């Protein structure tokens, strides 16, 4: 049997593609998923009464069609709105509200003055040209102190590469605050939460973790998903003009929602895209569950830029998962930094899970490389959609948006 469409991966992007296509009457379609269940980075586990979200997802979007898609499968009544969101940054021996540049007024006056002077003297304010790599851009935009004490160490821990290797094409993920606003917030001793780039008042399921949303979306699509099926071989049959997957499945069109470096191996490492693939890298994250003797804070999560801390983020589960056991916290740590014998969070370590892939690393040259890869395969009807297919640090609402758009535009073409 030759499928009209074959989707690689049944995470949020793959599920959206599958559901949207079937809604449009396309039934000659199959998704291959390496795991035993759908959902990818949006899955949740129960561990000794605690809920653990693999990716720490919350739902908020500016796109009505994305809201409609989610709430059609998982009604809004089964969610609640986290308002206010409480996210902190550990810095200078204390916790400051996120984002740091909007909340410098929460620091002691002597520290606040030093940070403000650093911001005022940034390269942008001095009229210097805009840099092309991340470290130089952060110094240019926010000054040396925010750069050296927060953003550089945090992003070094998160990405697992040196800051000068990072591009600037992902900085839309960072709140864009001007010098005048930084000064105003400090004088008024308040911030504008509407400046958050996302998730200022997110929705979250009333029970079961964010994975319940994925289960609801996947419920009617399971018959079109082949689980426990990793793509180990992918080739294009020039005679039949079809893709052959694992020497078992054939498809006229293949839509990839998985990391391209993994697919490159399954293709036999074609020389034509070797140079581009070398610029496409991703990291892995270890999600660790801890149980404490009491609830240490009312935060939803906290960023940890300190290099002496293994992990880079703490999520206080019982503060946002209503049916999770009390006193549970899960941390996120770049897999290359993780040592189970040297965890730095204080609590009983109950569970560690390493994601097969967590974040596409925004390396210099990444965007040009992925564009070339997508262009190369387009004529053979192999496409890429979502966080992994486009190799961009998309939140899951953007993955849904791009999947919906792909189906609409593909059918229109």
Give residue spans per PLM region:
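N-terminal Rossmann-like FAD-binding beta1-loop-alpha1 element of flavoenzymes
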Residues: 3-31
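Conserved Rossmann-like nucleotide-cofactor binding loop
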Residues: 13, 37, 261
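General small-molecule cofactor/ligand-binding pocket signal
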Residues: 80-81, 226-228, 351, 383
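Active-site/ligand-binding neighborhood in enzyme catalytic cores
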Residues: 112-240, 249, 257
């Amino acid at each position: 049997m030759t499928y009209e469409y074959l989707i690689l991966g049944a995470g949020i992007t793959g599920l959206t593609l599958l559901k949207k296509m079937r809604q449009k009457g396309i039934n000659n379609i199959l998704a291959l998923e390496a795991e035993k269940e759908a959902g990818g980075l949006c899955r949740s586990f129960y561990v000794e009464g605690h809920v653990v979200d693999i990716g720490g997802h919350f739902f908020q979007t500016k796109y009505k069609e994305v809201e409609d898609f989610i709430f059609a499968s998982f009604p809004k009544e089964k969610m609640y709105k986290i308002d206010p969101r409480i996210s902190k940054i550990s810095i200078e021996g204390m916790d400051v509200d996120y984002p740091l540049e909007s909340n410098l007024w929460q620091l002691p006056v002597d520290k606040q003055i030093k940070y403000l002077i650093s911001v005022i003297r940034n390269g942008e304010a001095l009229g210097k040209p805009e840099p092309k790599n991340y470290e130089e851009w952060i110094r240019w935009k926010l000054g040396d102190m925010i750069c050296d004490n927060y953003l550089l160490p945090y992003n070094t821990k998160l990405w697992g590469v040196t800051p000068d290797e990072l591009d600037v094409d992902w900085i839309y993920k960072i709140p864009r605050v001007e010098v005048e606003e930084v000064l105003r917030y400090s004088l008024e001793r308040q911030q504008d939460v509407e400046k958050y780039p996302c998730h200022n008042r997110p929705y979250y399921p009333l029970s079961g973790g964010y994975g319940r949303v994925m289960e609801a979306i996947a419920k009617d699509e399971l018959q079109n998903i082949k689980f426990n099926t990793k793509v180990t071989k992918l080739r294009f049959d020039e005679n039949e003009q079809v893709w052959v997957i694992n020497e078992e499945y054939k498809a006229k069109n293949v839509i990839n929602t998985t990391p391209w470096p993994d697919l490159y191996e399954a293709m036999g490492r074609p020389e034509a895209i070797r140079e581009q693939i070398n610029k496409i890298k991703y990291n892995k994250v270890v999600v660790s569950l801890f149980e404490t003797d009491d609830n240490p804070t009312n935060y939803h999560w906290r960023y940890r830029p300190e290099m002496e801390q293994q992990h880079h983020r703490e999520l206080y589960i019982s503060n946002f998962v209503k049916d999770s056991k009390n006193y549970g916290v899960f941390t996120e740590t770049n897999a290359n930094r993780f040592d189970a014998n040297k965890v730095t969070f204080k609590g009983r370590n109950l569970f560690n899970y390493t994601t097969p892939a967590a974040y596409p690393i925004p390396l210099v040259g990444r965007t040009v490389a992925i564009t070339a890869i997508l262009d190369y395969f387009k004529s053979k009807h192999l496409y890429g959609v979502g966080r992994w297919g486009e190799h961009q640090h998309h939140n899951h609402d953007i993955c849904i948006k791009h999947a919906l758009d792909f189906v609409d535009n593909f059918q229109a073409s």
